[in-house]
Amino acid sequence: MFLTGCVSSLSAQQSFWKEDFSAGKLPDGWMIVDSTKSAKCEWIVTDQPYPGSFQFEQQAPPIASTSRGYHMQFRPGVVTGEEITKWNQREEYPNGYFQTSAIDCAGKNDVVLKFQHLFRWNNWFTGKRAGLWVGVSNDGVNWKEYNVMDKIPAATQLHAPVNEEINISEVAANQKTVYLRFFWRDIFSWYWMVDDIELTEPFAHDLALEKVTSHQETGNTFTKEDVLKVKLKNVGSQPVDEDFTVTASLNNGQKLTATVTASGHPIAKQEEYEVAFPATDLTQMGSYKIEFAIQYPKDERSSNNILKANLFAARMNLGKLTKF
């Protein structure tokens, strides 16, 4: 992690609250709420894989979070099984959440919630409020909620954890009692794993690369004029109002560069921005390893400036064979 010589930046990055579930049990004062009527469907603390269920027979390994081991896991797919249609006819969803005890954020002018999670969801008969919702409250009654499904398509099997960073200052800044809630809502299956929940104060200048938006990891159809796109986010406490570049280094030797003209259109705090690279020919190989990198001199944290991705074609066209 890159740290500047500025004392205020150094102190601003320190975590002031964290839970990694290494004790192997629900922390004192936390609660688990199951709103189903027909069967128990509760969050659990576990270090075990998702055991598999209808239409997803294989196990999903435990989340490969930074701390590894114990994590929070919700597995509605095991409960609904092959009975999703019947659950839908009853207009009942396997909804459930876990909630922290009160967290002291007094004296914190900016608060960022960070956590790692892994999930797979089924879009059969989803409800109007369907989503993976993270709620923040300073009274335990009124909640500001964020849907953290990150536009991941239904049935996508993620392998690497998704790193979430949400600026929750609107609710949490300078509050003595702050509660966090992780709520699976109006989806019948399959699972959600959460680990390494943390509250920090943000850097002033901090851009983060989040994910590739132009391609999935597998099943791609590469073209001669392919446009790679990647999403970044301003997770700092200040707007970004200077131009910077983002590079994409491919394992075939290509290096693409895109310029973000933030001087004309500043990127506000918590704003996301999609970077598009110049079109390139990706038909020559069936898979690619790509390293994306932000080049922004003011950035005070380098650990989130790099994103490594693997892209695989659905099939590879070998062209016309002239000899065998």
Language-model features, listed with the residues they occupy:
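Extracellular glycan-recognition surfaces and repeat-rich motifs
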Residues: 14-83, 323
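Short, surface-exposed loop/turn segments at beta-strand-coil junctions that are enriched for proline
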Residues: 106, 169-173, 280-285
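Conserved Ser/Thr-centered positions that define the repeating blades of beta-propeller domains
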Residues: 100, 135-137, 249
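Extracellular beta-strand-rich recognition modules
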Residues: 21, 98-101, 105-122, 132, ...
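Bacterial Sec-dependent N-terminal signal peptides
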Residues: 1-16, 201
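Short beta-strands within extracellular/lumenal beta-sheet-rich domains
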Residues: 85-108, 162-165
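Short coil-to-beta strand junction motifs in C2/discoidin
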Residues: 125-133, 242-244
